[in-house]
């Protein structure tokens, strides 16, 4: 349903005022605080229309109006293009580039803390997921005559290691040749790139040690598919300072929610680009009274993880969207820069 310019202006002004003050907004408030060439009666009629259309609602204890989730959605959809088209000053890039590529966990923690400080809300940063990482290198270290320790490294510094049985008559040189061949064929591939046809080629190339190849691929697939979630939180108390969360039951639910890393990872893992979920658009009941702004960050042009900011539906969307978009961009730039300088 389209809104004429007058209704749009009134709706946006009410939302902006409510975000700032957390108090219902009435027609007299609008005429006193803002420049409207309209009478209070006309504004009241327009507000009544906006309420009938589902963009505003009236709390029982007030004559003023507050935005509904539909009102916020209209407001946010108008904002996103505008926020992303305005160049932002550098916020975090210098700090991120001080870390080495293998210090990805530190990078994630720094990003979470910075996001919370910049927005005054709660931040969530999903670290690089192994399933979205690219294979970097296999290394093997002899344990005894029947076993080697196989170490797998991804391009994001994630390391997995497992002991692997080998035939006792395999020389060090033969083992080295096998590892070199696997590295040559697999480097830069994600788990989805390792197709049945590629596995068939590897078996043919290394027919004498098919068992070792099979075990290596099994470890690789296991490591990529079953890695644990890595979610960093920042400012968990920030959201609890908002007036919407004075209810002790809500507070307990949120705090319990923040402790479940797997659930947090699930909430963030489907996000690519800039996404804003408002209220009941969120899939989890614990955050049905919240809004979540997320953006993905990338390495080598592919989505690697997600950063997010969780706050009340009365969130300062314009500021949060701009900050989240900028930090995601800077995190991508920092990771790409490390990739280039450390290769």
UniProtKB/Swiss-Prot annotation:
<dbReference type="InterPro" id="IPR036388">
    <property type="entry name" value="WH-like_DNA-bd_sf"/>
</dbReference>
<protein>
    <recommendedName>
        <fullName>Heat-inducible transcription repressor HrcA</fullName>
    </recommendedName>
</protein>
<keyword id="KW-0805">Transcription regulation</keyword>
<dbReference type="InterPro" id="IPR036390">
    <property type="entry name" value="WH_DNA-bd_sf"/>
</dbReference>
<dbReference type="Pfam" id="PF01628">
    <property type="entry name" value="HrcA"/>
</dbReference>
<dbReference type="InterPro" id="IPR023120">
    <property type="entry name" value="WHTH_transcript_rep_HrcA_IDD"/>
</dbReference>
<dbReference type="GO" id="GO:0045892">
    <property type="term" value="P:negative regulation of DNA-templated transcription"/>
</dbReference>
<comment type="similarity">
    <text>Belongs to the HrcA family.</text>
</comment>
<dbReference type="GO" id="GO:0003677">
    <property type="term" value="F:DNA binding"/>
</dbReference>
<dbReference type="InterPro" id="IPR029016">
    <property type="entry name" value="GAF-like_dom_sf"/>
</dbReference>
<keyword id="KW-0346">Stress response</keyword>
<keyword id="KW-0678">Repressor</keyword>
<keyword id="KW-0804">Transcription</keyword>
<dbReference type="InterPro" id="IPR021153">
    <property type="entry name" value="HrcA_C"/>
</dbReference>
<comment type="function">
    <text>Negative regulator of class I heat shock genes (grpE-dnaK-dnaJ and groELS operons). Prevents heat-shock induction of these operons.</text>
</comment>
<dbReference type="InterPro" id="IPR002571">
    <property type="entry name" value="HrcA"/>
</dbReference>
């Amino acid at each position: 349903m389209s809104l004429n310019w007058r209704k749009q202006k009134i709706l946006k002004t009410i939302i902006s005022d409510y975000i700032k003050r957390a108090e219902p907004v009435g027609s007299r408030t609008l005429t006193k605080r803002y420049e409207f060439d309209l009478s209070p009666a006309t504004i009241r009629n327009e507000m009544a229309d906006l309420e009938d259309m589902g963009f505003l609602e009236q709390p029982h204890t007030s004559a003023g109006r507050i935005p509904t989730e539909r009102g916020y959605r209209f407001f946010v959809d108008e904002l996103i293009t505008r926020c992303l088209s305005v160049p932002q000053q550098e916020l975090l890039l210098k700090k991120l580039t001080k870390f080495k590529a293998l210090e990805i966990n530190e990078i994630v923690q720094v990003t979470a803390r910075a996001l919370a400080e910049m927005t005054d809300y709660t931040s969530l940063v999903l670290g690089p997921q192994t399933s979205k990482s690219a294979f970097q290198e296999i290394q093997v270290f002899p344990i005894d005559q029947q076993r080697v320790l196989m170490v797998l490294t991804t391009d994001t510094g994630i390391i997995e290691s497992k002991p692997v049985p080998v035939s006792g008559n395999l020389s060090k040189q033969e083992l080295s040749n096998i590892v070199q061949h696997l590295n040559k064929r697999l480097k830069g591939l994600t788990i989805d790139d390792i197709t049945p046809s590629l596995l068939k080629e590897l078996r043919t190339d290394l027919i004498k040690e098919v068992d070792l190849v099979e075990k290596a691929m099994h470890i690789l697939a296991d490591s990529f598919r079953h890695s644990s979630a890595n979610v960093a939180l920042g400012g968990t108390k920030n959201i609890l300072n908002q007036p919407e969360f004075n209810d002790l039951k809500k507070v307990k639910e949120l705090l319990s929610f923040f402790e479940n890393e797997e659930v947090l990872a699930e909430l963030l893992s489907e996000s690519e680009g800039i996404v804003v979920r408002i209220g009941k658009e969120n899939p989890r009941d614990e955050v049905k009274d919240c809004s979540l702004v997320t953006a993905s960050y990338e390495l080598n042009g592919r989505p690697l993880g997600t950063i997010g900011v969780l706050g009340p539906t009365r969130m300062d969307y314009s500021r949060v969207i701009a900050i989240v978009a900028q930090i995601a961009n800077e995190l991508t730039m920092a990771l790409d820069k490390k990739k280039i300088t450390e290769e």
